[in-house]
Regions:
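Membrane-embedded segments
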Residues: 3-12, 18-25, 29-37
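Short, tandemly repeated low-complexity microdomains enriched for cysteine and small residues
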Residues: 13-19, 49-56, 146-151
Length: 185
């Protein structure tokens, strides 16, 4: 979708296996809307959601909890449970959703940019999408008072961190034991 690609700076690459990095957007909202209207005049496509359809301020606690479950089931394997992004196979990555607008999160669900699957309205309804977005807003607005936020980095980094600490500790202990044993003889 034109609005998502121009609005996020994640323009598709010439080779589909390459990961498109997010770039600073160079277009105003008006320019993006004009290009989107032109492309829509050529062929039908997903509509840009209205701000009212993405309003999450009136969601109840149960709906936010349901949004958390939907996100956990459909999104967290790639984006992390907090929406901070994560590693994918073959050097690709799922971007962080921390600073992504509600509109662009919704558009990404509907259009499936790059390696992301498309979530049609029969899979994730508009209400489901609002609940997921509401969950992300709630998660991102809560302060992290836990010190070193390793849990928000992602599974690959956490595993690497654990591997380095674990193996590094074993190597240090083995070296210490080897030197201690050599002196005892």
């Amino acid at each position: 979708q034109v609005d998502f690609q121009m609005g996020t700076g994640r323009i598709p690459m010439a080779r589909p296996e390459a990961q498109a990095p997010s770039k600073k957007t160079k277009f105003t909202d008006e320019e993006t809307a004009s290009v989107g209207a032109y492309v829509a005049s050529l062929a039908p496509g997903p509509k840009v959601p209205s701000p009212q359809s993405l309003n999450t301020s009136n969601l109840k606690a149960e709906e936010l909890a349901r949004g958390a479950e939907l996100f956990k089931t459909n999104c967290s394997a790639c984006h992390n449970i907090e929406g901070r992004g994560g590693a994918l196979p073959e050097g690709a990555y799922a971007p962080s959703l921390m600073k992504t607008s509600n509109k662009h999160i919704y558009e990404a669900m509907r259009t499936g940019p790059q390696q992301m699957p498309v979530f049609s309205k029969s899979v994730i309804t508009d209400q489901d999408a609002r609940e997921i977005i509401g969950y992300l807003q709630t998660t991102h607005s809560e302060p992290n008072n836990g010190g070193f936020a390793l849990g928000g980095i992602g599974p690959v980094t956490e595993g690497l961190f654990g591997w380095i600490i674990g193996i590094g500790g074993l190597v240090l202990i083995a070296g210490w034991l080897a030197r201690k044993g050599a002196r005892a003889k």
